[in-house]
Amino acid sequence: MATLRRLQEAPRHLLVCEKSNFGHDKSRHKHLVETHYHNYRVSFLIPECGLLSKELKSLVMDIGPYYSVKNLPLHELITHEFINTFVKKGSFSALTYNTSIDEDNTVALLPNGKLILSLDKDTYEETGLQGRPSRYSGRKSMKFVISIDLMDLSLNLDSKKYRRISWSFKEKKPLKFDFLLAWHPTGTEESTMMSYFSKYQIQEHQPKVALSTVRELQCPVLRSSGLAGEPEEACSALEFFDWLGAVFCSADLNNEPYNFISTYCCPQPSAVVAQAFLCTITGFILPEKIHVLLEQLCHYFDEPKLAPWVTLTVQGFADSPVAWREKEHGFHKGGEHLYNFVVFNNQDYWLQMAVGANDDCPP
């Protein structure tokens, strides 16, 4: 009976909400964006808008390329040349794709130079490297996590530690993966990813952009000062988060009696806007690009607008080994880790961060 009860229980999910102002010295918005490394979808919704401004449209269309490379040996990411060319001269991200975090070996390179390996027990033991059991592999540890600081390694390439890691990746347990790669250089000299990895199967990709206008959209009434909302006056942050998810899914918000797909309805109080502009960008999107987009959305209210707020939603890869910073991420039943900004016309904002069962509380 206890087993049946556990099976029927829904997995725990966490939603953390906070409010601040972009002008405050202690605002965490930039840090939260910069430390959510592996992003595959960015969406923004602008009420009372039928056409994007030139600045926003230009930014969306120039979000930057990313790359896919097949069968890339892992040792390529720890060479002196690679570290000096990419890791030390910008923000470089890499993530294995076509892999499942709860079943397969997965690897991520973070912009801070940390190489994270999530390996099954056999592979972990064969590498001969030191790591720790995964927090989400159960009583019998079947998954292990190895963290390698490339910046620290590069200080002494003749060290015993570097030689051991290099020997492991090249000879003892050579590993190859399909990777997604992206790079944001900090200087004027820009090496090309295509030429550097030319001996492998590498392709350049542009993010997919979907633009649409939602007509007669019923929107919750919000007050920037109150996350909890006020009865009959303003909706709560939680109600708004649910509503936004329904909008992104193109769900019917009217709860009509003949609708057997969705019984959801817009929280009250609400107001109908004639149109709202929805933009969705899908790819391998760097935090630096997202921060620029967030800043541009803040400037949307530099001139008077009918819209009381706009939103920016960012979803991470479900099979990334980390969510925020270097916190371990697991899949369980969804693998979700995402955040949403509600940007108000007075520069106040709500920040909503959501994770699934196999994650720490968002930072």
Swiss-Prot record:
<dbReference type="GO" id="GO:0004526">
    <property type="term" value="F:ribonuclease P activity"/>
</dbReference>
<comment type="function">
    <text>Component of ribonuclease P, a ribonucleoprotein complex that generates mature tRNA molecules by cleaving their 5'-ends. Also a component of the MRP ribonuclease complex, which cleaves pre-rRNA sequences.</text>
</comment>
<keyword id="KW-0819">tRNA processing</keyword>
<dbReference type="GO" id="GO:0006364">
    <property type="term" value="P:rRNA processing"/>
</dbReference>
<protein>
    <recommendedName>
        <fullName>Ribonuclease P protein subunit p40</fullName>
    </recommendedName>
</protein>
<dbReference type="GO" id="GO:0005655">
    <property type="term" value="C:nucleolar ribonuclease P complex"/>
</dbReference>
<dbReference type="GO" id="GO:0001682">
    <property type="term" value="P:tRNA 5'-leader removal"/>
</dbReference>
<dbReference type="Pfam" id="PF08584">
    <property type="entry name" value="Ribonuc_P_40"/>
</dbReference>
<keyword id="KW-0698">rRNA processing</keyword>
<comment type="subunit">
    <text>Component of nuclear RNase P and RNase MRP ribonucleoproteins. RNase P consists of a catalytic RNA moiety and about 10 protein subunits; POP1, POP4, POP5, POP7, RPP14, RPP21, RPP25, RPP30, RPP38 and RPP40. Within the RNase P complex, POP1, POP7 and RPP25 form the 'finger' subcomplex, POP5, RPP14, RPP40 and homodimeric RPP30 form the 'palm' subcomplex, and RPP21, POP4 and RPP38 form the 'wrist' subcomplex. All subunits of the RNase P complex interact with the catalytic RNA. Several subunits of RNase P are also part of the RNase MRP complex.</text>
</comment>
<dbReference type="GO" id="GO:0030681">
    <property type="term" value="C:multimeric ribonuclease P complex"/>
</dbReference>
<keyword id="KW-0539">Nucleus</keyword>
<dbReference type="InterPro" id="IPR013893">
    <property type="entry name" value="RNase_P_Rpp40"/>
</dbReference>
<dbReference type="GO" id="GO:0033204">
    <property type="term" value="F:ribonuclease P RNA binding"/>
</dbReference>
